[in-house]
Amino acid sequence: MQLNPKVSALFVYNSYCMIRTIMEKEGENFRMIEVKGLLFDLDGVIVDTAKYHYLAWKELADMRNIPFTAEDNERLKGVSRMKSLEIILEIGGVKLSEGEKEQCCRIKNDIYLQYIKKLKEEEVLPGVKKFLADARERGYKIALGSASKNAVEILSRLKLMEAFDAIIDGTKVKKAKPDPEVFLLGAKELELDREACIVFEDARAGIEAAHNGGMKAVGIGTKDHLSNAEACIPGLYYMTIDELLKELKASKIQS
C-alpha cells in the first residue's frame, strides 16, 4: 500500500521533531554534541609554573611572618592573584587594607616575573606540543583560559603563542574560577557554542568553572583529586584527541 505523499511528509517531520526533542532534552545527557573547541588552562596543563608561584607566594608570606606550605599552595590553584593573597592572609590571621593587598599582589608578581624570566621552551609539559598540533590538524579551535595575567609572557617564552586561536587571561576577566567567565569568553572568541567546547584543567575550581559554564571537563592529574571531571588523565601525552573523545563517550560527546 502506498502512502499519501502528504501523510508521508507529515510522518517524517513528526519523527524528526520527536528525535530532536529527545536529543536536546536537558539534564539527562541525551544531547549529542559535536566537539569543535578545546579550552586549556595554563598552569599545570601546558606548563608547570605552579612551583614558581609557590616560591613567590612563599617569599611574600615570609615577609609577613605567615606560615605557608606546599600543601597550602594547593588551595591557590586556579584562582586569581587577589583571591590567592586573601587565602594566605586568612591562613596567617592577617588583615590588610585594600591598598596594602594591592601592594602585596604587585610584590608577589614582581618576584614571580623574576622566576619566569628563566623559563625555557623545554619546560612545556610532555605531550603538549603534539596534542595541540594534532588538534589543530584535525580542525579544532583552540583557546587558553587562565587566571594568570602573565599568560602571554609565558606562552611567548615557551614559543606557543601560535598554537592558540584565542587567549583569555587575567587581564580580560574580572571573576575568578569557579566562575565560568574565562571559559565562556574563550568559547565566545572562538565563535562556538559553549556546549561544543571541552575544558582541560588541573584544578577542582577550574573543573567547576567548566561545569558552571555548561562545558565538559578533562582533569589533568589524579581521579582522587579531580573526581568532578568527566575524564581524568595524567597529562596530554597520555592519549590522542581521538582516544580522549572515546573516553568521553559516556558523556554523550561526539567528535
Q: Which stretches of residues belong to each language-model region?
A:
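A metal-dependent, Asp-based hydrolase signature
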Residues: 78-115, 134
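Acidic, Ala/Val/Gly-enriched low-complexity intrinsically disordered segments
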Residues: 7-12, 24
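Active-site neighborhood of HAD-like aspartate-dependent phosphohydrolases
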Residues: 30-73
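Asp-based, Mg2+/Mn2+-dependent phosphohydrolase catalytic module
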Residues: 13, 19, 27-36, 133-134, ...
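Cationic, low-complexity basic patches in intrinsically disordered or flexible, solvent-exposed regions
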Residues: 3
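Conserved SAM-binding loop
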Residues: 46, 124, 144, 199-200
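Short, acidic loop-to-helix structural element flanking the phosphoryl-transfer center
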Residues: 114-144
